Amino acid sequence: MLKDSRLSGIYPITPDVLLSDLSYEEVLEKIIASGINIFQFRIKSMSIRKTRRLFSLTYDLCIKYNVLLIINNNIELAKNFDDVGLHIGDSDINISEARKILGNNRIIGISCYNSIEKALNAQANGANYVSFGSMFPTKSKKRYTLCSHDVLEEVKKHIKIPICVIGGINHENIKSFNKIKPDMISMISGIFSEQKPSKIVTIMNTFNE
């Protein structure tokens, strides 16, 4: 199984709704240049042309700052770039099919919501990381499954690959993970609305040392 040291720290994800292309571009470079290791491109409600343009911008910035880029549920886009990974949700393509298309040298992450069984299956089938959440109520998704911190404590007993948490996480509640210490913490509005993204990265680095 491919291991990558960049599967750690704050894991920003693009919001579904952008105020404007200009504001997205401005905040995007701030975030990618803030010291993160990994970034996810996740845009589901745009034209193909606009999605490709924003992806190209994101890709170039990730190359510039040596940040691992993950594409959410778009294997057609992912297979055209040898150096990007793929994140798979519950109703998306399964990991076996993704591996056949992308090969064994790509990073593939799996959403497990609050299911230890899903995580064990993902690990057994070659996932590089698993994601749990929503950890808190969130406005980023209309429908979500809450995951308790107790589930994470149990997960850490059985899962050897990196663990990510997501959902409603911000600079105020991020410290609730001090004890559990997940490998990655995904943030959407929690970092895209932050004036100084490096502040969030510093908090994560402090308790994950």
Language model: regions and residue ranges:
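Conserved N-terminal beta1-alpha1 strand-loop-helix module at the mouth
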Residues: 1-94, 100-129, 154, 160-163, ...
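A short acidic, helix-capping loop that chelates divalent metal ions and anchors anionic groups
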Residues: 78, 136-142
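A short, polar/charged loop-to-alpha-helix boundary motif
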Residues: 93-95, 138-139
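Short alpha-helical segments enriched in small residues
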Residues: 148-149
